[in-house]
Each structure stands twice: as structure tokens, then as C-alpha cells.
């Protein structure tokens, strides 16, 4: 919880760096990037607050003398694929709750804003999340299909979170289905 709260504070402190980097990469306005950082920092705070709400539960059993329990455990590695058009908000959203639930994450950065997405990873590392907990992958646009296939097919990856176009979302959904992996799509 404390590391996510620290990451939120660091993100706020680095607002100017996010604005400068984002404007250079996508040409958007300072106001838009400032809003992105503010909302993303608050998403980290919300995820931090959720860490105290994650618990198991007792489930009524119809078998006399038996007790059923629901236990929540981390899934493992979660892949987030975030777009360029609201890069700080959407990448942070893909990472925050999986981290709060004890998972590790891989963010496949958008080819249009790799430095902005890399900054998110740097903030989380600086906040104290250990090596390998948050991983940011950048690549050339022409390598995207192979990168996505490798990420989705990797046996350590347990869930995929994608925000982007319907065309690419369909490809990711088909690939995830081939490996029987749950995918969350915002198209």
C-alpha cells in the first residue's frame, strides 16, 4: 500500500517531466498531460486503498459440517497494452489494480509514446517496487505483432489488459483465446 501511495506522490512531483515528455512524443497540450498525471496519480491512490479490502470469504455450504472458503490469491503476471492518446491514465489503469492485488505486470508501451510509458515504470521502481515487479517493454512499430504474440503466449502470463482499436483488440482476443487466457478489452 505504502509503495503505491509513494508512487502516486512521485508521479505528482514529476508532472512537469511527464508533460514535457508527452508533448514531445505526441504533440498534445500541457493541460491534457497535466490532467493525465493528476488522474493517474489518483488511480494509484485508489489502488492503494483497495489493498486493505482484498480478502477471502466464507461461502455457505449445503453439506452439513462442511465449510467453504473463497481465498483470493495473485494471478501472476499481467500484461497491459496501453495506447498513446491518454498514455499516463490508461497505462496506469492497466497496472495499478493488478499491482494492488499482488501481481507482477508487464506494460507493452505504445510505439507513439515509449518514453512516457517508461516514466511510469520509473516512478513505480523509485517508489520501491522490486526488480521484476513492473516491466516496461518498448519496440519498433513493425515488431508489434511478434511482441504481442510472444507476450500473450508466454506461460507466465496469466491475464491481458488491452485498450485500443477494435482491429488490434480482435487480434489480441483471438491470440488470447488460442492460449485460453482471459483478456480485458476496452475498444
Question: What spans do the regions from the language model cover?
Answer:
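N-terminal Rossmann-like NAD(P)+-binding subdomain of aldehyde/semialdehyde dehydrogenases
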Residues: 1-66, 126
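Rossmann-like NAD(P) dinucleotide-binding subdomain of oxidoreductase/dehydrogenase enzymes
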Residues: 56-187
Amino acid at each position: 500500500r505504502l509503495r503505491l501511495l509513494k508512487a502516486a506522490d512521485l508521479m505528482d512531483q514529476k508532472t512537469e517531466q511527464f508533460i514535457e515528455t508527452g508533448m514531445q512524443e505526441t504533440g498534445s497540450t500541457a493541460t491534457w498531460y497535466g490532467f493525465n498525471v493528476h488522474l493517474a496519480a489518483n488511480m494509484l491512490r485508489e489502488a492503494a486503498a483497495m489493498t486493505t479490502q482484498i480478502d477471502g470469504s466464507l461461502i455457505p455450504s449445503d453439506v452439513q459440517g462442511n465449510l467453504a472458503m473463497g481465498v483470493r490469491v495473485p494471478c501472476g503476471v499481467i500484461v497491459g497494452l496501453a495506447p498513446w492518446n491518454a498514455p499516463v491514465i490508461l497505462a496506469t489503469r492497466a497496472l495499478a489494480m493488478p499491482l494492488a492485488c499482488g501481481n507482477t505486470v508487464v506494460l507493452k508501451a505504445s510505439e507513439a509514446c515509449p518514453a512516457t510509458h517508461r516514466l511510469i515504470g520509473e516512478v513505480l521502481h523509485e517508489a520501491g517496487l522490486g526488480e521484476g515487479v513492473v516491466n516496461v517493454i518498448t519496440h519498433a512499430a513493425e515488431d508489434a505483432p511478434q511482441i504481442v504474440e510472444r507476450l500473450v503466449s508466454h506461460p507466465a502470463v496469466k491475464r491481458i489488459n488491452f485498450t485500443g482499436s477494435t482491429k488490434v483488440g480482435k487480434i489480441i482476443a483471438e491470440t488470447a483465446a488460442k492460449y485460453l487466457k482471459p483478456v480485458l478489452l476496452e475498444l
